Amino acid sequence: MDIGRSLNKAIDIGQIEGAFAQGQGWSTSEEFLYFPSTGRLFTTGPGNYKIPSALDIPRDFRVELLEGADTSALKTIFSSKGVGEPPLFLGASVFFALRDAVLAKRRQEGVSAPLHMESPATPEILRMACEDQLVQMARIPQTLKDGKTPFVIRI
């Protein structure tokens, strides 16, 4: 990721680490659930889903800023660039690592069907994607008995 010339390394590293944590939350917990009766959004904020805490993010990030690049072509203040939002997508690496773990479990269980797994990779979605015997016994149909619908649905 190109951030131009760093004006303050500590701030830039903090921005990268913070954006990673935000991206991790985005790709693992910020799930959109809707009320089936009204179509209104149920998960309207962090009161309805878990945001990453200090125990959920890596203790050791190992962020390095490379120096010595020619930034003379940049026509910005002190040849710098914004660093706050670009690293947000680094959090997707967590999603893909979890997806690889699920694929390994599915191979172990003898499941050869293709895996369709969308973000966010919530614990529930990860567990259901494993397709083992316990998951098969716990499946809840989209339409319940007597034509009733679940409280919230995933679209």
Located regions from the model:
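Cofactor-binding beta-sheet edge motifs in enzyme active sites
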Residues: 1-155
